[in-house]
C-alpha cells in the first residue's frame, strides 16, 4: 500500500500551550505519579495548555486561519490536498476511544460517498476494537457541521476527514484513576 501512498504527518503543534503545560506539570508533579484525580498534577490551572499564546484554540481555526500556526499548516495542506486526513486528539480521561463516523446530522455539502466511506471505515475500526475488547464509541458526538475542525475542513475540501480521540487530556498526567476504577497511564495512551 505504501508504494502508492504519500503519508504526511502534520507537525503542527501548539508550542505556547505545550510549554505552558510542561512547565506547570514539571513544577507540580511529584517523583511518583499520584493516581488521585484530586491531586494538583491532574488539575492544570487556566488557561491550560489547549490555547496558544493569544488564547485561541487552534483546533477551531482551520477555515478562519486567524493564527500563524494555522496559516503555516494550511499552506502545506492546501498545496497537497490529501485524500484522507485523520485528526488525532485526546479527550477527557473517562471517555473511551472515539472514531468516525461522526454524529448526525452531517452537513448538506458532505457527499453520500464521503458519508459511506467514513461509515465503512468506522465499522472496520469497531470490528478491530471488538476483537480486542477495547472500549470505544462513535456516531454519538463530534458532528461534521462546523467547517473549521480538523475533520470538517478536509471533508468540505473533498477529502475523507476523520477525528480520532483517545482518553487522556491534560488531566491524565502519567497515570490517573478513572471513574470506573481503571488506571489510565501515559503508556496506555
Language-model regions: role of each:
Residues 32, 36-43, 48, 66, ...:
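Generic serine detector
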Residues 118-124, 189:
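Long, well-ordered alpha-helical scaffolding segments within enzyme catalytic domains
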Residues 1-120, 130-131:
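Active-site/substrate-binding loop(s) of hydrolase catalytic cores
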Residues 74, 122-126, 161:
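Predominant activation on well-ordered alpha-helical scaffold segments within soluble catalytic domains
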Residues 134-189:
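Hard-cation-handling environments
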Residues 4, 126, 130-139:
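Gly/Pro-rich turn-and-neighbor structural signature
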Amino acid at each position: 500500500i505504501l508504494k502508492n501512498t504519500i503519508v504526511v504527518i502534520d507537525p503542527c503543534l501548539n508550542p505556547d500551550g505545550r510549554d505552558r503545560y510542561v512547565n506547570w506539570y514539571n513544577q507540580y508533579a511529584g517523583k511518583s505519579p499520584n493516581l488521585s484525580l484530586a491531586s494538583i498534577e491532574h488539575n492544570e490551572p487556566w488557561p491550560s495548555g489547549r490555547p496558544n499564546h493569544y488564547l485561541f484554540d487552534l483546533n477551531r481555526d482551520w477555515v478562519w486561519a486567524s493564527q500563524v500556526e494555522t496559516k503555516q499548516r494550511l499552506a502545506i495542506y492546501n498545496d497537497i490536498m490529501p485524500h484522507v486526513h485523520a485528526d488525532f486528539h485526546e479527550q477527557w480521561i473517562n471517555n473511551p476511544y472515539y472514531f468516525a463516523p461522526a454524529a448526525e446530522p452531517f452537513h448538506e455539502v458532505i457527499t453520500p460517498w464521503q458519508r459511506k466511506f467514513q461509515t465503512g471505515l468506522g465499522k472496520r475500526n469497531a470490528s478491530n476494537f471488538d476483537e480486542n475488547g477495547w472500549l470505544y464509541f462513535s456516531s454519538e458526538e463530534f458532528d461534521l457541521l462546523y467547517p473549521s475542525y480538523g475533520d470538517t475542513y478536509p471533508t468540505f475540501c473533498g477529502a475523507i476527514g476523520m477525528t480520532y480521540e483517545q482518553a487522556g487530556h491534560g488531566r491524565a498526567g502519567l497515570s490517573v484513576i478513572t471513574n470506573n476504577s481503571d488506571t489510565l497511564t501515559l503508556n496506555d495512551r
